[in-house]
């Protein structure tokens, strides 16, 4: 039995609130159960130095947690003067995931920066960030299209979403919350496109190694879950 009472293949309640920020070109408050992340997309008329005069744009991401996003206050990384390795890893993952579905040449020589700020954490912050950031990116591109800067369907090639899966209490489960994640025997994150392409898989055995059969079971759970997330994204942007 999962602590939340969910079935092994049941995700938490997922919701997207678009246009959460009045200033950003695109924004979305994404909720995976009690994990809440504010994702904003900002258009910048510049590119990294290595892309200047190439005709290509760039999509990048930053990730952070508010001090009381967790049970005990965590120190702001800005006050320590450096980002943790975990923060750097997660924001690079978010950026890679979004670039996988963007035509950087069609974007042109400009940059879109995604900021993913965790308001409340209960497991799965990176997967929620990726899934919500896609909506913020989409809405930023729609903002650009409304000003005749780009065509969305030329820049945004597909959906992208992410979900965690793991082995908890000897059972493969999807969308782990904090209680499950902290006690999981195996923990994995899957990032996939709307057409089923695999962008990234991160998997770790916390205790005994997991078998190929167990991995394929987790992959199957992730494929089903991400298909559901993509459907929810489609519903959100159609509203």
Swiss-Prot record:
The keyword Ubl conjugation belongs to this UniProt entry's keyword annotation: no
Molecular function as annotated in GO: 3'-5'-RNA exonuclease activity; tRNA binding; tRNA nucleotidyltransferase activity
First-level EC class: transferase
Signal peptide boundaries: none
Domain of life: Bacteria
Residues that hold phosphate according to the record: 86, 124-126
Keywords: Nucleotidyltransferase, RNA-binding, rRNA processing, Transferase, tRNA processing, tRNA-binding
GO BP: any one term: rRNA processing
Family annotation (Pfam families): RNase_PH (PF01138), RNase_PH_C (PF03725)
Annotated EC: 2.7.7.56
Catalytic activity: tRNA(n+1) + phosphate = tRNA(n) + a ribonucleoside 5'-diphosphate
SUPFAM superfamilies found in the cross-reference section: Ribonuclease PH domain 2-like (SSF55666), Ribosomal protein S5 domain 2-like (SSF54211)
Disulfide bond entries: none
HAMAP family to which the protein is assigned, alphabetical: RNase_PH
Assembly and interaction partners: Homohexameric ring arranged as a trimer of dimers.
Family: Belongs to the RNase PH family.
Functional description taken from the UniProt entry: Phosphorolytic 3'-5' exoribonuclease that plays an important role in tRNA 3'-end maturation. Removes nucleotide residues following the 3'-CCA terminus of tRNAs; can also add nucleotides to the ends of RNA molecules by using nucleoside diphosphates as substrates, but this may not be physiologically important. Probably plays a role in initiation of 16S rRNA degradation (leading to ribosome degradation) during starvation.
Protein name in UniProt: Ribonuclease PH
Organism listed in the record: Allorhizobium ampelinum (strain ATCC BAA-846 / DSM 112012 / S4) (Agrobacterium vitis (strain S4))
